[in-house]
From Swiss-Prot:
Organism name: Petrotoga mobilis (strain DSM 10674 / SJ95)
Name of the molecule in the record: Threonine--tRNA ligase
GO cellular component: cytoplasm
Source taxonomy: Bacteria, Thermotogati, Thermotogota, Thermotogae, Petrotogales
Principal location listed in the UniProt entry: cytoplasm
Residues the entry annotates as binding Zn(2+): C334, H385, H510
Amino acid sequence: MVKITYPDNSVQEFKDGITPAEIAKGISEGLYRNAIAAEINGELKDLNTPIMQDSTIKLITLDDEIAPKIYRHTMAHIMAQAVARIFGEDRVKLAIGPVIENGFYYDFDIEGHNLSEEDFSKIEEEMKKIIKEDIKIIRKEVNKKEAIELFKDQPYKLELIEELEEDTISVYFQGDFYDLCRGPHLPSTGYVKYFKLLSVSGAYWRGDEKNKMLQRIYGTAFPKKEQLDDYLNMIEEAKRRDHRKLGPKLNLFMLQSEMAPGMPFFLPNGKIVLNELMAYSRQVHKKYGYVEVETPQIMNIKLWHQSGHWDHYKENMFFTEKEDMPMAVKPMNCPGHILIYKNNFVSYRDLPIRMFEFGKVHRYERSGVLHGLFRVRAFTQDDAHIFCMPSQMEEEIIKVIQLTNEIFSTFGFKYEAILSTMPEDHMGDIESWERATDALKKALEKSNMEYRIDEGEGAFYGPKIDFNVTDSLGRKWQCTTIQLDFQMPERFDMVYADENDAQKRPVMIHRAIFGSLERFFGILIENFAGEFPTWLSPVQVSILPVSEKFNEEAKKFSRILEQEGIRVYVNDSDATVGYKIRNEQMKKVPYMIVFGEKEMNSDTINIRTRKGDTIENVSKERFIEEIKNEIKNRNLDLTF
């Protein structure tokens, strides 16, 4: 007999080999119909998994948070089966088909056919047939020899099988289709009916440009139609907000893939926004006791050997050599900050030292993964390093969390925290890692922050906290990182003198709030759909003279606004007022003033907002004061 412990800690005994499906049926017919998988001793398993020992169990239904990982994985298999049916099993070579955020994909190598979105309708129809057939999904475990025989005509699967160390390999069957997979999967193909194929693209096998280019189909799936509809509407809205379209359109930035791939050019309007972001960041950092520094772009490669970046990061670095000195373009700012620290004698009275830099870094990314401002090769970090005594580190991390909260609240962002622990490829001893991880946990808990743990995803030199912000479309973006580091101070022999003049090792905290200024800029463009709050808007007020005779007075009024620190543009073209209004609305200028006889001869104006609202008879003095306050307070919403 086996003892089964439920989430409410109640215990029930069953015969050896009982399955979660049988347990669900014993509880209620409704639960049996709705269950799709089970969490057994913390691991996701199929409903038909035999339980041979005392275990904890949680039955998973379509409403559970983990459910999308299961049903979208099955949908990837259904799509692969449909593609094989349509184009022929002998012509379709299967690669991989994982679940990703909000969806899934599958990579194919199809002889004699290039997939396009025109193929989607017939693939979707075949998928619907497979779903309607409600084919049972069966997991079988085979040895390596049997797996090789099963997949003898599937070269990509064979490559994966050959690399597996274990001899027991799981294969999932649905009718005449089978795939190499760890699972778990739905009990049958009929459980989830609402899906959509989204796009097709090229993808190198295993992400290596030296390998063959495969064809990747992306899709998504939901248990309810309204959930799918909401997601598809969100995708359409995201396309409208795409920073790669809005950026050039609003004169913010441009990309030159031929001349400088992954290295954005910032245009006049974009530079204004970046300068505002940096000015705000400097103001907040000064408040929290940081000093700003600047470090060189190119430094001797021996620095990167000493820091450990050479061993862990050289494939992502750029190099040059002059006067027989091999140099590296910095991929990170931390070694430079360490050299500044070591430039002077440091006493315990000097600590903590909070060193801050807008540091331009360069990291090689494959051309295939470059993506607007989100994935680039050159970017600016709002990078800081805090050097402190071990007794100060918890308090310093709490202060970084407070600083992060202050900055994100200014942009209206909510965020979640993820604690990432020691990866396999790491520096230093386990005891130091445990001490660092514990300090991060305590800081989060004392800050009353909920967090989840991401095992094995820390940096090579220390555990970290990542903060993911949620934008206006509900999408999550990783921005802030806080990393605790005992390794770099050791490698660089960093010391401070304690109260007894004994040399002690400081702790180093790495942190960036925006993360990358470029990436954060892209997030802001999409979050606000280009309609920045007034304080960030490149042009804050546009004045639109009704005709040429009002141009001079309009310019006089613009100079008054400029003297008050307001960014103004006067559209003195010969175009009609209606055209001028439409043009400024397309530029997403917060406020427009149509300037005619009344505006020239009185102290009142009519204000038009980019949303199309009109506010009449506002005194010029009041307008100026209200806009100044809106800018000073960095309000998210328009005052008028």
